[in-house]
Amino acid sequence: MKAWKKTIVILFAKAYNDAKEYVFVLYLEGKRMDTLDELYFTMLKNAADGKVELAPEGADPKIVECFVLPDDGTVVRVKPCLCPPDERHCEDACEWDALKPGGEVGIAVDPKKCVGCQACIDACEMESLKTKKDIIPVVQELHQYDGPVYALVAPAIAGQFGADVTLGKMRATLKALGFTGMLEVAAFADILTLKEALEFDKNIRSENDFQLTSCCCPMWIAMIKKLYHQLLPNVPGSVSPMIAGGRTVKALHPQAKTVFIGPCLAKKAEKNEPDIEGAIDYVLTYQELRDLLTVTNLNPAEMPEDSQPHASTTGISYAYAGGVAAAVKRTLEKLNPDRKIKLATRRADGVPGCKEMINDILAGNRDGNFFEGMGCIGGCVGGPRAIIPKEEGKKQVQAYADAAEFETPMENPYVIGMLKALGFNTVEEFLTKSHLYDRQF
């Protein structure tokens, strides 16, 4: 933060302290701390060491709550907003009407409207808005919870912690941190790929019919629900792969805690949506996991291999823009190769691009019948909490997808085995008789 900004914050801190609002001047062992990062890493290290008291004496309790108390919000205000009412760039940047005037403290975030896109955080010049972190409560669960705690990793994880860090090494790393096991969310994307292919085969009967995807992107789904709700009948009734994974784990292990790990902030908001809450207990970003590895001195590259491949090429491909549409198309071609009306895709990534595509659909300018939207440029590999550039991320994911033993979920024995554990003999039987992965929009 620039020096003049820091000075302003300190000048205003005492006035707001009387109102029990956020104070930015922190103290650690008698020494003043001028950044939230110092407090965050101190608390994270204490949690990793198994200490009960995490925050140093003198730390503002409201700021401590940002790190240790999960709530129903993704964006939190860590100090008062000092911007004039007509110069609040965060409010202008929000597409979802989630930021409103907040009395003496300037701005308030409505967690029910916020989708976690981070636009307001990027626009806030005073650094008053931050994203909620779940890593400290997760570490506490790993130390204190008696039941199993499973990590569910998004397919964009390939290459995020180093080009030589395989999924097997990441599994060993997560187990060393205390997780019971690691599951690839791409395996659940496999099942949803077949679900969407079957939905397309059932519902697209004429040249005027069309389907909107992707269920995996909460920003895309939120855009349709909040801004273009007239198109909801064209959205397949499916949960995201993250929610599908959480529901499956809890169906097989009711006492389990589920922790999703990915590059996306919007997933923190998605897990709390009323119709799907409970499937995922915590959402971590890759950067939060990296922070934990830093304070525990664990290097994934030095860990042994614990390889248990779960996913097929199509499921892994969900991580980059165009991957979902390609996955459904390849699966549909195997499912019904003689289909007369072929799947014709159009995709968009980034909020402006998605809006342009939707407006074309509403105007009748449809040049496809299967439309994929991703809120981030490049798809999940371009998520705001990815560690490596999206171009490198896509390259790493494609290499991992190409190396997969199975091309589609129809040949994937892990998927079949998982469904048999749920009481179904085939994917088709599961999708027609179970509502575990259904969602009503």
Give the ranges of each region predicted by the language model.
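Alpha-helix N-cap/helix-initiation motif
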Residues: 83, 113, 234-238
